[in-house]
């Protein structure tokens, strides 16, 4: 699903240049649930932006679903994002003046789906994340955990092959965080590839494999846990 080979990324030039990613190579197979861990400044946010086709890289190669992602136009990048990737963010990124159902339906609006069809699908996806009864509520009327579930439903409605979750539990309490991770694991068990960026060790432990970044390099890919997995 994801293959990264020798990725390098820096910001700025000359003496002001900051190297953020240094020869990063990794793979994520179809159907995996993987976490990427690292402290502030480790490069994990930059790596996520590259995975999500929100930023380019300077050297190396990134293959997503066997397609080389490199020097794409804005239109091409948007095409692959919309077709292949669903996003979940720490801050939810919901529109406050639209209901939960309308927020979930929004990606389909941009795909030209009719109002009736997209609202029907949005209700189905809210049911899937346990929030069908909250479909008409505004984000301000929902708890943090409910808002994040709405965000997950919105990410899933376009039927992406890859779900990228950037610190999805960062704004949630412990119990709600674990409930959200249970939902992501359930989604993964249904066949979707899920990558979770986190700085929380307990959240990373709920994934099948952890890739650790330090100073822009892959420090480890959790070999001990990998060895415990079936077939390892």
Across the structure, where does each feature detected by a protein language model lie?
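ABC-family P-loop ATPase nucleotide-binding domain
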Residues: 1-10, 220-232
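ABC family nucleotide-binding domain
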Residues: 2-213
